[in-house]
């Protein structure tokens, strides 16, 4: 479905075939005759999700956009937001990304894409303490995070940073920092018309995953602070997220997300405190989500891998608050209560 939310501003909501991502948005701003038009984010790579690539080309055809007259502004470096950047760049599109976020995304994704990085991650969460069959089953599940994504971050790009601005038709797009979901996530907003392309910073349907694994210290506390700032600064704006329908009144979604993380952190704290002994990261996640009570399907193991990232961010937040302490033993993350 394509909707024109302002004159010359289009949002196309696309269904995907990917685990954990039911739909995503392609947003376009039509430039003046002498200008390049703009696309905000570009979905999964076609090799990983052929329907995503087909949908983008069909929307571009219907709206009359050509790759060689297109600037693609990336909100953040996750593969469901820059997946087709390489293909579009090969056809003449210019890709703009925050270099800080590309660096962090490379670190995070290497943990699953690269064999050495994956072993490091599995050691950190405590998988090496389990039987070989469990380890290999999770290894196979982790392949879904690499298959179809070869070279996905390997494309030429131009830097774009908070404070930059550009004119696109009647719209002056300004760039703002929205840290939390990733370290360098960006928002693109039109002050006069009061709308903002907000990536995955604020979503109505789910609480975005926050991860401390990688070079992003204090990720959750940064995210909570940034949510409050965005809700206050853009309180009367139309939010155009990376997933889901555009919405107003961001305060409702922000408060829902913060409540979710506070409840989740409280639950993790009580799990660790009740144990009376150090717990591995994977065990804490299993208890919190009540998983691993039966053999898991491969899709469920894929979800569990994503849970590790969120759980670690929450535990590091509790450590920052002085409630828990982490100890690394032979590369594995153990947690115990300080209160």
Regions found by a protein language model. Name each.
Residues 2-63, 188-204:
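Conserved beta-strand hairpin/beta-sheet module of binuclear metal-dependent hydrolase folds
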Residues 8, 29, 41, 76, ...:
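Divalent metal-coordination and catalytic microenvironments
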Residues 19-22, 158-160, 179-182:
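A short catalytic or substrate-binding loop motif that flags glycine-/basic-rich loops and adjacent residues
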Residues 37, 72, 94, 196, ...:
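Hydrophobic "anchor" residues on beta-strands that sit immediately upstream
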Residues 42-46, 50, 148-155, 172-265:
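Metallo-beta-lactamase
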Residues 48, 54, 59-166:
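Active-site HxH/HxHxD metal-binding segment of metal-dependent hydrolases
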Residues 71-81, 181, 185, 243, ...:
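Histidine-centered divalent metal-coordination motifs
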Residues 271-339:
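C-terminal regulatory/interaction regions
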């Amino acid at each position: 479905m394509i909707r024109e939310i302002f004159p010359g501003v289009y949002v196309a909501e696309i269904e995907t075939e990917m685990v954990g991502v039911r739909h995503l948005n392609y947003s376009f701003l039509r430039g003046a005759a002498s200008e390049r038009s703009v696309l905000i984010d570009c979905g999964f790579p076609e090799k990983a999700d052929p329907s995503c690539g087909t949908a983008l080309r069909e929307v571009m055809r219907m709206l009359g956009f050509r790759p060689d007259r297109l600037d693609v502004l990336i909100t953040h470096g996750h593969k469901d937001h820059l997946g087709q950047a390489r293909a579009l760049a090969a056809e003449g599109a210019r890709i703009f990304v925050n270099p800080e976020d590309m660096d962090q995304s490379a670190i995070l994704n290497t943990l699953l894409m690269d064999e050495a990085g994956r072993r490091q991650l599995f050691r950190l969460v405590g998988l090496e303490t389990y039987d070989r069959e469990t380890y290999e089953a999770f290894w196979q599940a982790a392949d879904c995070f690499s298959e179809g994504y070869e070279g996905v971050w390997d494309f030429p790009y131009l830097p774009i940073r908070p404070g930059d601005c550009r004119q696109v038709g009647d719209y002056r797009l300004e760039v703002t920092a929205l840290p939390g979901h990733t370290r360098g996530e960006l928002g693109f907003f039109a002050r006069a018309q009061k709308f903002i392309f907000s990536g995955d910073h604020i979503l109505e349907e789910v609480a975005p995953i926050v991860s401390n694994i990688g070079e992003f210290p204090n990720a959750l506390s940064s995210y909570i602070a940034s949510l409050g700032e965005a809700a206050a600064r853009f309180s009367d704006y139309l939010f155009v997220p990376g997933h889901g329908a555009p919405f107003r009144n961001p305060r409702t979604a922000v408060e829902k997300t913060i409540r979710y993380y506070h409840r989740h952190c409280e639950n993790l704290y009580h799990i660790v405190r009740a144990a009376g002994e150090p717990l591995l990261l994977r065990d804490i996640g299993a208890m919190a989500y009540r998983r691993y009570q039966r053999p898991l399907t491969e899709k469920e193991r894929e979800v569990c891998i994503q849970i590790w990232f969120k759980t670690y961010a929450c535990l590091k937040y509790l450590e920052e608050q002085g409630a828990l302490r982490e100890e690394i033993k032979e590369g594995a993350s153990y947690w115990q209560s300080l209160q």
